Amino acid sequence: MSTDARFWIVVPAAGVGKRMGADIPKQYLDVAGKPVLQHTLERLLSVRRVTAVMVALGANDEFWPELPCSREPRVLATTGGRERADSVLSALTALAGRAADGDWVLVHDAARLCVTRDDVERLMETLEDDPVGGILALPVTDTLKTVENGTIQGSADRSRVWRALTPQMFRYRALKEALEAAARRGLTVTDEASALELAGLSPRVVEGRPDNIKITRPEDLPLAAFYLERQCFE
């Protein structure tokens, strides 16, 4: 594999965040004086080795043009799809002709605004010579139960369970083909690693930070603001 592989970032941002119950998509909600997506893009653009960030937007996104990062030279945009995998695939298709087959693509959730530059760079450095790639993840510390109809059926072995975070980093061609194959089979993939797993590959995990949270519910907003403030003093 070429040692000249570049690093691209894909940010699926076409969702509306129904669980937030807000009037605007959650990626545009204010946290500590800035929209969530602005925070996220600033963090990603702080990584020097990133060639460009491709953002997959909703078809009628009226908020994007107002975002300062939308005018950054390294920020590109395309129209996303209904599901996360559709948006990622749209972004990868938009990168055709720019990204080489062996280039790395890091897919990052728009709503993970607390990701740190150190975590992204460590993911790159750890996996850049890996044949498959991998993801930021966090070992599970809680006891996990399998439940059916409200009744506990068993306990998971938490020593073997990690919580998937983002970015998730894979070769351009391998990721695109894995997502296309899953779509042809009608399979739902909730993250990029799942698509690679279905293709018979074994992504690696790189331990990330517990404050790399995803904005999902209203109570996540003040928590994210707290983490952002705390990170300023590190």
From Swiss-Prot:
Please give the catalytic activity noted in the UniProt record: 2-C-methyl-D-erythritol 4-phosphate + CTP + H(+) = 4-CDP-2-C-methyl-D-erythritol + diphosphate
Q: In which pathway does it act?
A: Isoprenoid biosynthesis; isopentenyl diphosphate biosynthesis via DXP pathway; isopentenyl diphosphate from 1-deoxy-D-xylulose 5-phosphate: step 2/6
A GO molecular function held by the record: 2-C-methyl-D-erythritol 4-phosphate cytidylyltransferase activity
Question: What InterPro entries does the entry give?
Answer: IspD, IspD/TarI, IspD/TarI_cytidylyltransf_bact, ISPD_synthase_CS, Nucleotide-diphossugar_trans
Which residue pairs form cystines in this protein?
Answer: none
Q: What class of enzyme is it?
A: transferase
Which PROSITE patterns does the record associate with it? ISPD
* Site (Transition state stabilizer): residue numbering on this chain: 19, 26
Q: Which UniProt keywords apply?
A: Isoprene biosynthesis, Nucleotidyltransferase, Transferase
Q: What is its EC number?
A: 2.7.7.60
Swiss-Prot/TrEMBL site (Positions MEP for the nucleophilic attack) positions = 158, 214
Q: What Pfam families does this protein map onto?
A: IspD
Biological-process GO terms, alphabetical: isopentenyl diphosphate biosynthetic process, methylerythritol 4-phosphate pathway
Key word Zinc present: no
What HAMAP family does the record point to? IspD
Please state which protein family the record places this protein in.
Belongs to the IspD/TarI cytidylyltransferase family. IspD subfamily.
State the function annotated in the UniProt record.
Catalyzes the formation of 4-diphosphocytidyl-2-C-methyl-D-erythritol from CTP and 2-C-methyl-D-erythritol 4-phosphate (MEP).
NCBIfam families named among the record's database cross-references:
ispD (TIGR00453)
Instruction: Write down what this protein is called.
Output: 2-C-methyl-D-erythritol 4-phosphate cytidylyltransferase
